[in-house]
Amino acid sequence: AYLSGKKYIAVSNEQSSNESNIEGEKINHQYSKSFEFEEEFRWYINNYLEDHVQYFSMLRPLNELQIAKLFSNMKKYHKIFRSCNIGSKETPWKWCCNCSKCLFVFIILSPYLYKKKLVKIFKKDLYENKDLLNIFIELCGYGEVKPFECVGTPEEVNYAISRTIKQLETEGKELPYLLNYYKENYKLVDTNTDIEKRYNEENNVPKEFEKLLKDLIFNDENEKI
């Protein structure tokens, strides 16, 4: 950006990237995605390069649920998006369906996409995979440690799971293995919260882009598809 005279360096690290992975220790598995790094890198640019270059994350004000909800409507990308590090080592890049990233993305999309759509993306119903139980428990925040991967917070995971369970029960459908395990062992969280309408003010998004983000969040009332 500096050499080519560009004004912005925009990355895509959401609010959840700030959460540490080790309880009692502020250890982030990928420091470069945290707001702390963003602030320090901006300081470096301003002091050693040119202050006209702005480094920021466009997604910093948003949580994983908000991003998943918005993405659920971007149907043309459902066939091609990937977020699996294990599957990235294969050609073509695919979802391995056995790791914490795959399960997290499946969970976070489940309140907004019906099972048929999710299975079309992942080729499997990950909620029926008993081998994922330990990862499932860790993602919910009930394990010894949060998976050392780019996954969301237990608050986001528990909200998505609880909302999906309530949706399936309202529709009179049987709960898949992992969701049934959750209901039998944990208390469903309150889904009547503001979590889908929050705007994290700890961000460096330029003013000219703020309205776009807020319009997307506060005016988005899409139904499950």
What are these regions (language model features)?
Residues 1-225:
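Nucleotide-activated chemistry modules centered on ATP-dependent adenylation/adenylyltransferase
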